[in-house]
């Protein structure tokens, strides 16, 4: 933190969740991750549990190997897609990677993602990139994905996120997760739980008291979808 602030960045987010966020006017936004994936995107946790082993390094400088790098880009894209949707820029990023001089083997990247159970949707996202920017013909899967993305805005929608979670966990499961998030999720937002797990009930209570006043519009949208569903 001291290094970043010494470089002129202001700290926007520190010590909880999976990353710290720094901002420097007019446009620089830097996320420093403690983990590549948290509770959201947990299906990729096993794939990227030891990211250092997926890298080449020169002294203290580590870089993902090309196929591992693209696998991570895909995983991050899928995570956002399933959280609530994603924008056109994400698909453009995939095309840029595939047509860069990195010599990426997309097939190997898909293979790396197989343990997550998300390799198929990752493949469809990469295929959509070729449809939009490479002139490839649509398949049924890419057309459905295109329609979903066009309805997602730049960063996805709360409604999409809620519907996706209800589909995975059921209505009651989603409701309980809203009220009582998992211990893993709570640790990301209440670091004290790393030292004192016994405080989980107290943190749940604190969250229930404060949550109605934070992101109020988002919370109301989640409840609206839950009641409608």
Give names to the regions the model predicted.
Residues 1-229:
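Conserved NTP-donor binding/palm subdomain of two-metal-ion nucleotidyltransferases/polymerases, i.e.
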């Amino acid at each position: 933190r001291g290094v970043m602030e010494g470089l002129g960045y202001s700290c926007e987010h520190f010590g909880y969740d999976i990353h710290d966020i720094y901002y420097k006017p007019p446009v620089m936004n830097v996320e420093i991750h403690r983990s590549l994936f948290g509770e959201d995107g947990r299906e990729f946790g096993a794939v990227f549990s030891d990211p250092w082993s997926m890298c080449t390094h020169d002294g203290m400088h580590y870089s993902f190997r090309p196929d591992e790098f693209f696998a991570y880009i895909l995983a991050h894209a899928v995570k956002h897609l399933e959280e609530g949707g994603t924008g056109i820029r994400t698909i453009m990023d995939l095309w840029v990677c595939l047509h860069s001089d990195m010599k990426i083997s997309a097939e190997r990247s898909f293979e790396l993602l197989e343990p997550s159970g998300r390799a198929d949707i990752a493949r469809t996202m990469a295929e959509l990139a070729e449809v939009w920017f490479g002139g490839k013909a649509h398949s049924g899967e890419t057309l459905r994905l295109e329609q979903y993305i066009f309805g997602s805005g730049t960063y996805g929608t709360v409604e999409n996120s809620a519907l996706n979670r209800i589909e995975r966990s059921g209505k009651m499961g989603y409701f309980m997760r809203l009220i009582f998030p998992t211990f893993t999720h709570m640790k990301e937002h209440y670091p004290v739980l790393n030292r004192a797990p016994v405080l989980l009930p107290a943190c749940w209570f604190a969250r229930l008291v404060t949550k109605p006043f934070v992101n109020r519009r988002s919370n109301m949208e989640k409840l609206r979808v839950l009641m409608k569903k």
